[in-house]
Structure formats: structure tokens, C-alpha cells
């Protein structure tokens, strides 16, 4: 766990309005989910993040097998990373093993309140450029974190839909799903 500083901003507007004004459209916000598990002030619980991802999939009208990429909350803490791995596997089922997951916090540190904005920008750019950013500094991957974490090098990846997870202290969870533009 390393603290960082930064922020990211995106403009959200109706598709027709953006097209009419000639805006460059990077992605579509397809769905979102939230949950609060109030399990512990700092220790995570897998159920809240799982429900959050399921809520986002339902809101987007998608099945788990339509997701290709997850930008994880990924704090690089043993408890947090194991918890999120289990939540991703619970939400995506057997398809989780086919999804590329990364944590951009491995490169930026944890921006706390600024993390969600910047990591959403990274997620949209991954979708736009069809490339998963790496999770750097994975040299001895925890066997309990057994998903494809795109270790140490970016990878070309056909992405139609991407998930962005952010989890906060006290069990506040948020998930966004972005898709290619129509």
C-alpha cells in the first residue's frame, strides 16, 4: 500500500448531445452499482463488493461473460486483494478466469478520494485503446489471488465492456461498467 496524489475528470453527457457538438466520445457509461456492507471500518468483506458488481451488471443489462477487463480497486494489501479476487470470482463465476484484471494503483499509489476518478479515466482509456494497463511489481503473486492480473507489461486486449471497482472505508462500494461507444 502506497499513498499517491492525483485526480481524474471525465465529462458525462447524453450521447446524442455529444455527437451533435462533435465531441470525441471515448466510451459509454453502461451501468453502475453500489453497496454498503458496514462489515468493519477498514477490513473488507467479499459480499459487499460482489453485490456491487452484480448490481452494476444488472443495471447495464449485461451477463458476466460479456466483461473482458476489470480495473480493480487493488490496494496491494493481502486482505484487500484476496477479498476483491473472491468478489470478482463470485460476481463473474467461471468467466472470471478469462477476464484480465489490473490495478492502476500499482503505478499511481492510492489516491484515496481521488482514486475513483483517475482510475475511471484509465479504464475508459484501456477500452478506447484496446489495451490493458499492467499491474506492475508483481514478482511473487499470492496464490489466493489467482486471476490474470496482467503482470508487469501492458497487453493488447479486445475490450467491449470494462468494470471499474472502488471500495471505501466502512464498506462503501462502487462499480461502474463502461462500454464501447455505439
Predicted features and spans:
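A short beta-alpha structural unit
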Residues: 32-37, 69-77, 104-111
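Short beta-strand scaffold segments in enzyme catalytic cores
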Residues: 8-11, 173-177
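Conserved small-residue
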Residues: 11, 29, 67, 72-73, ...
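Condensing-enzyme catalytic core mediating Claisen C-C bond formation in acyl metabolism
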Residues: 1-62, 69
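Structural signature of cysteine-dependent C-C bond-forming condensing enzymes
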Residues: 15-27, 51-65, 86-107, 115-169, ...
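Short glycine/threonine-rich loop-to-helix capping motif typified by GTGT followed
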Residues: 38-49, 75-92, 111-118
Amino acid at each position: 500500500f502506497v499513498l499517491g496524489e492525483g485526480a481524474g475528470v471525465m465529462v458525462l453527457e447524453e450521447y446524442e448531445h455529444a455527437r451533435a457538438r462533435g465531441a470525441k466520445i471515448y466510451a459509454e457509461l453502461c451501468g453502475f452499482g453500489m453497496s454498503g456492507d458496514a462489515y468493519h471500518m477498514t477490513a473488507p468483506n467479499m459480499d459487499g463488493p460482489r453485490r456491487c458488481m452484480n448490481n452494476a451488471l444488472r443495471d447495464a443489462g449485461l451477463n458476466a461473460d460479456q466483461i473482458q477487463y476489470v480495473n480493480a480497486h487493488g490496494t496491494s494489501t493481502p486482505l484487500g486483494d484476496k477479498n476483491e479476487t473472491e468478489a470478482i470470482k463470485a460476481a463473474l463465476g467461471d468467466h472470471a478466469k478469462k477476464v484480465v484484471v489490473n490495478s492502476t494503483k500499482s503505478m499511481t499509489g492510492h489516491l484515496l478520494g481521488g482514486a475513483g476518478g483517475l482510475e475511471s479515466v484509465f479504464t475508459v482509456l484501456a477500452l478506447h485503446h484496446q489495451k490493458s494497463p499492467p499491474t506492475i511489481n508483481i514478482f511473487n503473486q499470492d496464490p489466493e489471488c489467482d486471476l490474470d492480473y496482467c503482470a508487469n507489461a501492458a497487453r493488447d486486449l479486445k475490450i467491449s465492456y470494462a468494470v471499474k471497482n472502488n471500495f471505501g472505508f466502512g464498506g462503501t462500494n462502487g462499480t461502474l461498467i463502461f462500454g464501447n461507444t455505439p
